[in-house]
Amino acid sequence: MQIQENPGAVSRAAQERFGEAYSVLRQAIADHAFPGCAFGLLVNGSVLLHDSLGNFTYEPDAPRVNPDTLYDVASLTKAVATTSAAMLLYQRGLLDLDTRVGDLLPGFVIGRDPAEHARDVTVRHLLAHTSGLPGYKPLFHTAATPYAVLRGCLEMPLEALPGARAEYSDHGFILLGKALESITREYLAAWVMREVFTPLGMTASRYCPHPAIRAEIPPTEEDELFRQRRIQGEVQDEHAFLLKGAGGHAGLFSNVPDLLRFSQAILEPRPESLFQPETVELFATRQPPEGNSSALGWDTPSGASSAGQYFTPGSIGHLGYSGCSLWIDRRDNLAAVLLTNRTWPHRESQLIRSVRPAFHNALRKAL
């Protein structure tokens, strides 16, 4: 699906039209919310904004971010890669969303106390973050291999009955990725590259960037806890790192043009296109229980959402821990991408939380 793009620098008219959005981002850089960013806006199939600000780090001689800079998009992997794989497998009749996870991954139920009801956890629960699995446990403190990470997730005690509570869970998506691999019979990363990214023309998106291009990717962190070195051009997430750089929850590197191409496929699904309308509608629908903002693999606007005030009901989006976000408004036919390395040099800063809604509000007010 083609997107109209205007080659060359952003016009002065566009910079003036979206001046408030630029101001939000410039102030964020000045406040050290992040050292630089790339961003884009797609409306009715046309790219109205595709630009960048700032640098890779806060050092004066650091490389400048350009509009096509590749970023570690962290948990955007869950939506753009893993959920897309689930969508296609569902469309092709290869995945029933109500399949029990234990039927795909027997290690998830073997040896468990029946009172946990792990046998009742389904693929749908994993997508909706309602499996009962905890949100996050640092398995990397004791796990040193992909097998150890997977085993830690498989054996992790449930903290709620399946479907009873919503809790965003990395571990659930690690298991989801492995469950999908049991269907595709190949590594999820390779399958997604071939079946999702190649058809959509997402030529920059990849896992495990080649060492030759790592210097062209903004660093995410000076890691003093786990790897004891600068993390640049390799996945920041510790569990994804132990999973050879690619997990169902993290590992993807992408850029603004590719994420806008992906968004266009979501915004204008057709029977003959990659994503069919009925599939998009299903995966964009909020899931129980009451109060859960998650659809299937996607978040939806709720309360003080990172999407801001103007994304309409039916919009879907996702955040990445590294400082990235993608929001898609299906009613108003638009998508907004913001890519940053807000975790540089250390991950404690939470200033991005106020930047995201302010940026999205400024974009929407300019339309």
Feature-to-residue mapping (PLM):
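Short, compositionally biased leader-like segments
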Residues: 1-18, 296
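Short, conserved catalytic-motif segment at the N-terminal edge
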Residues: 11-73, 94, 111, 151, ...
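Active-site SXXK
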Residues: 19-26, 39, 45, 72-98, ...
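Short, surface-exposed loop or secondary-structure junction motifs
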Residues: 50, 57, 112-313
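Short, glycine/proline-biased beta-turn/loop segments that scaffold the active-site neighborhood
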Residues: 96-113
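Short, gly/Ser/Thr-rich active-site loops of penicillin-recognizing serine hydrolases
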Residues: 268-271, 278-279, 284-286, 303, ...
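Short glycine-rich, acidic/polar surface loops and turns
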Residues: 314, 321-328
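Short, well-ordered beta-strand elements
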Residues: 326-327, 333-342
